[in-house]
């Protein structure tokens, strides 16, 4: 039986490419040779099954007033159950949490991630084993990146990040 790894994330997990000139195929989604999830699958080999659950715009817990069902918290039960048994869950979220419309600071984003982790642990998808969750910090937003989607919130991600100590404190 293969070891099942589920990668739950946002556009970084989906493989969204903001500038098609940066993509070998010239499209808006990186190909299987470029996406980190596919590279992980290749590196691990046939004894593992790496599954992408990436969605552009996905947040940890923040309900988007413009686009519905974008928060991982409200959909994680169904997502995790649809992929059970999960041996490792990789969470790579937080970039979209800094959108200006959410008004969240680093501590609030960290608390949201902790809430999502606790919810994921409670889902019966682990085959009777202890939940195994790896949180990967999203890459920094490049300086000067600002648009109508992210707003001024992207400046927050340049200079702050949720404290891993604060996230561990509630365990």
Tell where the protein language model's regions lie, with residue ranges.
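Conserved SGNH/GDSL esterase-like catalytic core that processes O-acyl groups on lipids
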Residues: 2-6, 15-127, 132, 142-150, ...
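Short hydrophobic segments within beta-strands
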Residues: 8-9, 136
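Active-site His/Glu-centered metal-binding helix of metallohydrolases
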Residues: 12
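Short glycine-enriched loops at secondary-structure junctions
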Residues: 137-141
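Single conserved hydrophobic/aromatic residue that forms the stacking wall/gate
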Residues: 159-170
């Amino acid at each position: 039986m293969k070891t099942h790894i589920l990668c739950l994330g946002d556009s970084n997990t989906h493989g969204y490419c903001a500038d098609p000139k940066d993509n070998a195929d010239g499209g808006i989604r990186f190909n299987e040779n470029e996406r980190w999830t596919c590279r992980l699958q290749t590196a691990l080999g046939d004894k593992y099954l790496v599954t992408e659950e990436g969605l552009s715009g996905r947040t940890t817990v923040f309900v988007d007033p413009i686009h519905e069902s974008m928060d991982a918290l409200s959909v994680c039960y169904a997502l995790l159950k649809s992929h059970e048994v999960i041996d490792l869950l990789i969470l790579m979220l937080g970039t979209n949490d800094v959108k200006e419309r959410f008004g969240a600071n680093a501590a609030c984003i960290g608390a949201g991630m902790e809430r999502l982790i606790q919810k994921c642990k409670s889902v019966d998808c682990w085959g009777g084993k202890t939940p195994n969750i790896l949180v990967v910090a999203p890459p920094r937003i490049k300086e000067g990146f600002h648009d109508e989607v992210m707003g001024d919130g992207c400046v927050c991600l340049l200079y702050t990040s949720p404290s891993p100590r604060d996230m561990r404190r509630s365990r």
